[in-house]
């Protein structure tokens, strides 16, 4: 079996960390925690880079809360923007994306382009039309 042990660390640079923070903050720029990171992006991108290079990264605790939507109680898990979401984006972009995207189902992962519910629906519809029964 092929191993991908050091694939992530070869692709990480300071510019890539800065780009990842900006990409992860898309559609979240009104949150105070995101504004704090973006106001001092050079410091946080350097900190993210050193965290990954020294293998000293630790994910923070996920916040759990409940909302009531249409009479149904839903349990929501919210991970902190820094470092959790930034590290997720970083690991996905710097090596795992090429490995994972080819192996996941269309409908199971909506975070990446050309994946998610709509692409899955088109795929299933095409499979049903092409089937012989």
Q: Which stretches of residues belong to each language-model region?
A:
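Short, compositionally biased low-complexity segments
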Residues: 11-27, 60-64, 93-99, 129-132
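Mobile genetic element proteins and their domesticated derivatives, centered on retroelements
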Residues: 32, 67, 90-91, 124
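Conserved pre-motif C helix in the palm subdomain of viral-like polymerases
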Residues: 72-105
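Non-catalytic, polymerase-adjacent accessory regions of viral genome-replication enzymes
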Residues: 1-46, 50
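Active-site-proximal segment of RNA-dependent polymerases
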Residues: 2-7, 92-133
């Amino acid at each position: 079996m092929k191993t991908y042990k050091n694939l992530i660390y070869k692709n990480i640079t300071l510019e890539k960390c800065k780009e990842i923070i900006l990409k992860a903050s898309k559609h979240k720029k009104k949150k105070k925690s995101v504004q704090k990171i973006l106001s001092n992006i050079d410091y946080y991108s350097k900190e993210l880079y050193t965290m990954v290079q020294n293998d000293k990264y630790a994910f923070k605790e996920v916040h759990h809360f409940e909302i009531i939507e249409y009479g149904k109680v839903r349990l929501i898990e919210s991970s902190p923007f820094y470092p959790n979401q930034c590290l997720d984006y970083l690991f996905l972009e710097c090596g795992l994306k090429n490995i994972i995207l080819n192996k996941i189902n269309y409908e199971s992962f909506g975070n990446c382009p050309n994946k998610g519910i709509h692409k899955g629906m088109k795929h299933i519809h095409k499979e049903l039309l092409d089937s012989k029964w």
